[in-house]
Amino acid sequence: ELVLEGEMVEAMRAGQFLHLRVPDDAHLLRRPISISSIDKAKKQCRLIYRIEGAGTAIFSTLSQGDTLDVMGPQGNGFDLSDLDDQSQVLLVGGGIGVPPLLEVAKELHARGVKLVTVLGFANKDAVILEKELAQYGQVFVTTDDGSYGIKGNVSVVINDLDSQFDAVYSCGAPGMMKYINQRFYDHPRA
């Protein structure tokens, strides 16, 4: 987890990401990391990432007050503009695709939107942000191996939901996204 502070926070939207330069000369490529929460009053954003190699491992060694070269915000983010307290929204996240949904949930909950969140992980050790997301609505957790929550992937839960959703927002692995695209193919806000 990183908490960044700066003027660019004012331009951030839920669902966007930042390109972070690894603070050493051996790593030339920037790392794209999703924004998990935004606090415009404090000009701070929180990034939750998984250590995948030497570059992200270096991020984990940073201390408060260290500076980073950051490009962003990048991406379009999610359009939440017309959702209100009469709306019901489905959030679907898988693995490291869960963090960007936290800001979406926070903003929609503040408007009174009813949220149902379905999270998918490989196993119990990979589960993140369940409690934080539960502050904003109902949360279902699936694990591939059944070590926590419901055994299977997000489709096991989604196929049993009988609710009509005004919007569906998702972030995760290509296989999960393919399922969401097929399942909600005709949905105008998926």
What are these regions (language model features)?
Residues 54-190:
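FNR/FR-type flavoprotein reductase catalytic core
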